[in-house]
Amino acid sequence: MTSLREFRKLCCDIYHASGYKEKSKLIRDFITDRDDKYLIIKLLLPGLDDRIYNMNDKQIIKLYSIIFKQSQEDMLQDLGYGYIGDTIRTFFKENTEIRPRDKSILTLEDVDSFLTTLSSVTKESHQIKLLTDIASVCTCNDLKCVVMLIDKDLKIKAGPRYVLNAISPNAYDVFRKSNNLKEIIENSSKQNLDSISISVMTPINPMLAESCDSVNKAFKKFPSGMFAEVKYDGERVQVHKNNNEFAFFSRNMKPVLSHKVDYLKEYIPKAFKKATSIVLDSEIVLVDEHNVPLPFGSLGIHKKKEYKNSNMCLFVFDCLYFDGFDMTDIPLYERRSFLKDVMVEIPNRIVFSELTNISNESQLTDVLDDALTRKLEGLVLKDINGVYEPGKRRWLKIKRDYLNEGSMADSADLVVLGAYYGKGAKGGIMAVFLMGCYDDESGKWKTVTKCSGHDDNTLRVLQDQLTMIKINKDPKKIPEWLVVNKIYIPDFVVEDPKQSQIWEISGAEFTSSKSHTANGISIRFPRFTRIREDKTWKESTHLNDLVNLTKS
């Protein structure tokens, strides 16, 4: 059984390794001949763990300030300079309530058991007891590691591809398809990963689209032909049905709020009368009595009340699994034809997505113009012979910003990293916001632009919604995770960028700026479009995505 001390050393070695091959080799050598491979890999990828601990960095600080009898304010201030694990380690070492162990005695199994128990409690008193108990058997470095596992970020600069491909060269691609880590580990020794396929009731990484700024580019990418599909301004939903059981997952593979999808349990069996088990890729949209889509955000309970005679409608655009058959390796035109054979439309409830087989540039231009005239968001272009590749950006999207707002082919989903005091009537409150993106290579957050222009009501709400730490533009208080030039140091920084809001930002065009740290990329005339509540930081626009957007 692997000890926590061995695991910590592995994490340290991975962090200091120079590149992909070296990191993967370290992991491969470490897990060879070990019986607890699955546990090691699972804990190396805490972000994929579906256990919920009901506590963010601020809550962890609060609880350990009580346990250590230390100043919560001092601990929060220390957190502003670095990461939660370092802060807890520092104050654990200094506290006089619980003496840290001199020697590590915990196994990974002990830690995993603790995490499972922690995920089962919600009362603060129970959390305090569990956190006290684990601290009492930890060294300072042990507790730092445990807290980082709770925070779901080990800071080892190695994501799923690095870790999973240490098991087998194609393990990462198989995982994106099956989302079943345990099955991959169990089959890795048999060299039989290709046999692993979709599992009903387990979410699949959705296939994605990259931006496209010209009709000509689309034909270069799909020379053998393409489908142009209406880009619906709703919420992506992956539908799973297994006999009489149903599951509905969002684009980030989390369960969809029940009020948005409960009605589907009645209509899916009617639309798919022959299906025992099925997995669908689709979009749920609020439509009026004429089946015309209503604006994004109208799916909320309160917003829906504003639209009388409206219905939730599922626009189905793909079938990924049907009665034991994994259909992801079948060409799109065959999947679509099959879908037509097995699905019966229920008007205003479950319908086919609007799809056009494109044969020339003039036809594509006409379809795009028609979509924009109807005030739809744009088009998604798909290779007519394309297979379904989970998690990969093989499709193209053309949105209205490309034609109507200048040369930005697409908006960017940026994370709120900080804020500045407003001026005049907005003085004394956060009114201007620092937006940025995550750099996968460095593990840091980079700045892209400042954004303002919110109305008074929105600003009032944001004061409470955004969890900020006041740093008063002090360079010494810039957290380790943020890379920002001196002229853009904010009055406030977010407590945790991975828990911060994601805003869709559009503008006139992407520009070059030596003052911003996201490879010098910024946005001219940036404007807030909407909050992307359907996305986590992982689905936001990362630095490499931003670079691709500017190229297109």
UniProtKB/Swiss-Prot annotation:
GO cellular component: host cell cytoplasm
CDD domains the record matches: OBF_DNA_ligase_III
GO molecular function, one term: DNA binding
Database matches in PROSITE patterns: DNA_LIGASE_A1, DNA_LIGASE_A2, DNA_LIGASE_A3
Keyword Membrane: no
InterPro entries in the record: ATP-dep_DNA_ligase, DNA_ligase_ATP-dep, DNA_ligase_ATP-dep_C, DNA_ligase_ATP-dep_cent, DNA_ligase_ATP-dep_CS, DNA_ligase_ATP-dep_N, DNA_ligase_N_sf, NA-bd_OB-fold
EC numbers on record: 6.5.1.1
Coiled-coil segments on the chain, per record: none
Residues holding ATP: 229, 236, 283, 382, 397
Lineage top rank: taxon: Viruses
Predominant location category: host cell
GO biological process entries: cell division; DNA biosynthetic process; DNA recombination; double-strand break repair; lagging strand elongation
Keyword set includes Protease: no
Residues binding Mg(2+) 1: 283
Subcellular location: Host cytoplasm
Keywords per UniProt: ATP-binding, Cell cycle, Cell division, DNA damage, DNA recombination, DNA repair, DNA replication, Early protein, Host cytoplasm, Ligase, Magnesium, Metal-binding, Nucleotide-binding
Catalysed reaction equations from the record: ATP + (deoxyribonucleotide)n-3'-hydroxyl + 5'-phospho-(deoxyribonucleotide)m = (deoxyribonucleotide)n+m + AMP + diphosphate
Binding site for Mg(2+) 2: 377
Listed cofactors: Mg(2+)
Function: DNA ligase that seals nicks in double-stranded DNA during DNA replication, DNA recombination and DNA repair. Recruits cellular topoisomerase II to sites of viral replication and assembly.
Subunit-structure text: Interacts with host TOP2A and TOP2B.
Protein family: Belongs to the ATP-dependent DNA ligase family.
Protein name per UniProt: DNA ligase
Record organism: Vaccinia virus (strain Copenhagen)
Phylogenetic classification of the source organism: Viruses, Varidnaviria, Bamfordvirae, Nucleocytoviricota, Pokkesviricetes
